């Protein structure tokens, strides 16, 4: 799996950063899952290597405009191209009325169904938000000025590496039967011999995990959600020098994001959602924000629009 940042600015877009949105490209299928959809997201998609037609799920963290204003427009555009299977949208309960009102008021009729799922109960009760045979999604309550939710996408463990040579040495003819053995199934050949696939596979390979936390001040629930994840994307709206403002607005500093990564034992941290006050011409530059976080958590990277990063 990999992610592509479509917007990395906090509050308002800048000349170099759009407002919040991130695309997760699944390795198991051709699907793309979108996290937040600020104004201008569909334009960012056009500039990226992400195909909007592959978007099947959209996860919204909270109802602030810089995270949702691009959603009705994106859905309207997708409606022109057609998407017969529909799109699932996860987020706060108010999200459904916002989207349907915008579409109805503009006389927009989609050519595909929208399926909304409110996340409040799943977050408060620590229930699985979504699960299939390869992935599961959890969410958790964050700490912001209005209800906000972080998301974790966890890939289930994959079968171990299949030992082709061992299968060949056992005179098992190559073909579809190898796939069954790799899946751990017991198969019987035409000559009557039976083989257990687990005997031909190495130990299971641990699945990848990705966590997206914004907007929030430092939160223990974000730490718990991020435990042992391969990649944490966490907001870092403010420098440590502006900590007072972070507490007033319930946003994170670079130190808070790095502390979350450290306490949750993640492998890699990418900081995003930067305040537009930090530019190449300001006294505190984006590169300074990165250095602040790296002092606490060395394996930290700075997000920028269109950056693509592997989960593991």
Swiss-Prot record:
SUPFAM superfamilies: Metallo-hydrolase/oxidoreductase (SSF56281). The keyword tRNA processing applies. One of its GO terms (molecular function) is 3'-tRNA processing endoribonuclease activity. The active site is at residue 66. Pfam families: Lactamase_B. Binds 2 Zn(2+) ions. Zn(2+) 2 binds at residues 66-67, 215, 273. Zn(2+) 1 binds at residues 62, 64, 144, 215. Keywords: Endonuclease, Hydrolase, Metal-binding, Nuclease, tRNA processing, Zinc. It is an enzyme of class 3 (hydrolase). Its cofactor is Zn(2+). The keyword Nuclease applies. Its EC number is 3.1.26.11. It catalyses: Endonucleolytic cleavage of RNA, removing extra 3' nucleotides from tRNA precursor, generating 3' termini of tRNAs. A 3'-hydroxy group is left at the tRNA terminus and a 5'-phosphoryl group is left at the trailer molecule. It comes from the Bacteria. InterPro entries: Metallo-B-lactamas, RibonucZ/Hydroxyglut_hydro, RNase_Z/BN. Homodimer. HAMAP family: RNase_Z_BN (MF_01818). Belongs to the RNase Z family. Zinc phosphodiesterase, which displays some tRNA 3'-processing endonuclease activity. Probably involved in tRNA maturation, by removing a 3'-trailer from precursor tRNA. NCBIfam families: PRK00055.1-3, RNase_Z. This is Ribonuclease Z. It comes from Prochlorococcus marinus subsp. pastoris (strain CCMP1986 / NIES-2087 / MED4). The gene is rnz.
